[in-house]
Amino acid sequence: MSPAQLRGSVLILILFDVCEEVRLEELRRILGLQPAGREPSFKHPAPEYVRFESPPVEEVTEKVTLATGEELEGRLKYYDYGVLSVEFELAFEGSWEKLVALSSRYVAGSEIERHAARLAQQALKRVTPALVKPYKQWLNEDYYIFHVREIEGQPTAPELIKSYGDQIAQIVRGENAPLSEGERREVLQSSMSYSPSDLVVVGWNAAFVYDTMAGAATTIQLLEYANSQLLEFRHYDEVLTRELKGVYLSLEKGTGFLARWRLARASARLHTLLLDVTELTERADNAIKFLSDMFSARLYRLAAAKVGVPDYKNLVQQKLDTAENLYKFMVEQFHQGRAFVLELLVVIILIIDLIFLFRGKG
């Protein structure tokens, strides 16, 4: 390679929240795949210390040709908690300037997302029996990973940041123009290295990874998992927002005698939703385990924080707490209404008894 030349690949992840659950065993049967073990079927398998409870199912899909003539390799990945990831990969060789321009064009463009949506729709038509409660409308997230395997001179991570920190920051931001010193510093603060010869810089919608193919496999998977979690928590946030809006409308109609019986039905629906969302969030939250690997755990926390998982997770928890309080209030209102009815019945029975008693004496 000539000086300042890079070799690697660009990975584009377009994730869709398509259903409440994917039955992976049924999916494997439909796709004609062998039953999987507990390990994810990576192109380069992750180490033993990073483990999925239910490994996502992968399948190769058709290649996609962009308007520029670039040809992207395609893969689909199905997660059991209802997320479909459409992954594209483009081999890259060139200068830092070329990679900066490529990042700016991909991050700002929409052509790849349209191809991803088309492939997702085609795929889901084939595997419909494996989908539990498919959604009519899909939320989606996109993420770009610029994986550099080789750099002339084999610089260490500190040398790379010192010599090419400006370009790395531009790549992670998806900006063709130079960044200010403050922006550059903010981007590079979100960097990690396991050894002097590797580096990952994580941004909210893109990441720069300098590592071997085998070494980068876990990093790439953790970045994808963090984005799938973000998608799930965004979905739960929307579901809870809609349900709470309906509850507030019911409460605005009053809590009179008849309204309290209506609140009983609303509280039952709310309680069912509470249980469902709690179960589903726990499943998405605990889908991956780190077995005595603190670096991968720290890398995941960094990735999750950058893409916004904790923010949406907190929003969901706040709305779950609000829903729990509203449920208790509605149940209390219903019990008060029922107690009033029972007391009224007792009084009516006593009055009837007294009437018959006095009539008998008369």
Predicted feature locations:
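Short secondary-structure boundary segments
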Residues: L27-F52, A216-H235, I352-R359
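Membrane-associated alpha-helical segments
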Residues: H235-D353, G360
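Short Lys/Arg-enriched alpha/beta "domain-start" segment
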Residues: M1-D198
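Extended, charged amphipathic alpha-helical segments
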Residues: Y164-W261
